[in-house]
Amino acid sequence: MKIYGVYMDRPLSAGEEDRMMAAVSAEKREKCRRFYHKEDAHRTLIGDMLIRTAAAKAYGLDPAGISFGVQEYGKPYIPALPDMHFNISHSGRWIVCAVDSKPIGIDIEKMKPGTIDIAKRFFSPTEYSDLQAKHPDQQTDYFYHLWSMKESFIKQAGKGLSLPLDSFSVRLKDDGHVSIELPDGHEPCFIRTYDADEEYKLAVCAAHPDFCDGIEMKTYEELL
């Protein structure tokens, strides 16, 4: 397993954007051109290039020659590399990517105040009870731990919104370990949280417990 990250401390330069646009597919270029905000296009480009760079490094490929497909529920994959599973997430200034030999999910969330009201609608009764039991000063922090863990689980399962958020429960214990109450018939999986930034929560869900130790940071130059 590998986790790669890029922190956007500045916008892409015109030259960097042009080189990345030249490496991605025509469909991705068109998607980037349709974004109203340039930073959204840059996040999309960087996420695409993170995957290309990871695949190229692992398999000795030309990054620009990699083609992507889409599974039934919209999860991207590389048809030529059936043993390479990956997932991308971005929020705020962060773009992260997880790569493994088995299905994997990753989610990063920038924390914002005043968002925990949606917990009762989307979280399981167990999760909502855990959240309510936290001190008010800790509730936003724990809410985003729950949200990122649940999103990583759904992305690992690869079933999109067909898997309701309240159909399973996750719990972050005081020692940092995560317990999961799985939906009926679901394959075993494991979740770990990572420290990316004090303003963000990051979680990875994998089919095995052998997580990597941390995030391997990449610069714009390393993606070109």
From Swiss-Prot:
Mg(2+) binds at D107, E109, E151. It holds the Pfam family AASDHPPT_N. It is an enzyme of class 2 (transferase). Its EC number is 2.7.8.-. Its cofactor is Mg(2+). GO terms for biological process: antibiotic biosynthetic process; fatty acid biosynthetic process; lysine biosynthetic process via aminoadipic acid. Residues 158-189 are annotated as: Peptidyl carrier protein binding. It comes from the Bacteria. GO terms for molecular function: holo-[acyl-carrier-protein] synthase activity; magnesium ion binding. Changing G15E: In strain: B3. May activate the peptidyl carrier protein (PCP) domains of surfactin synthetase SRF1/2/3 and iturin A synthetase, by transferring the 4'-phosphopantetheinyl moiety of coenzyme A (CoA) to a serine residue. Required for the coproduction of the lipopeptide antibiotics, iturin A and surfactin. PANTHER family: L-AMINOADIPATE-SEMIALDEHYDE DEHYDROGENASE-PHOSPHOPANTETHEINYL TRANSFERASE, PHOSPHOPANTETHEINE TRANSFERASE. This is 4'-phosphopantetheinyl transferase. It comes from Bacillus subtilis. The lineage of its organism: Bacteria, Bacillati, Bacillota, Bacilli, Bacillales.
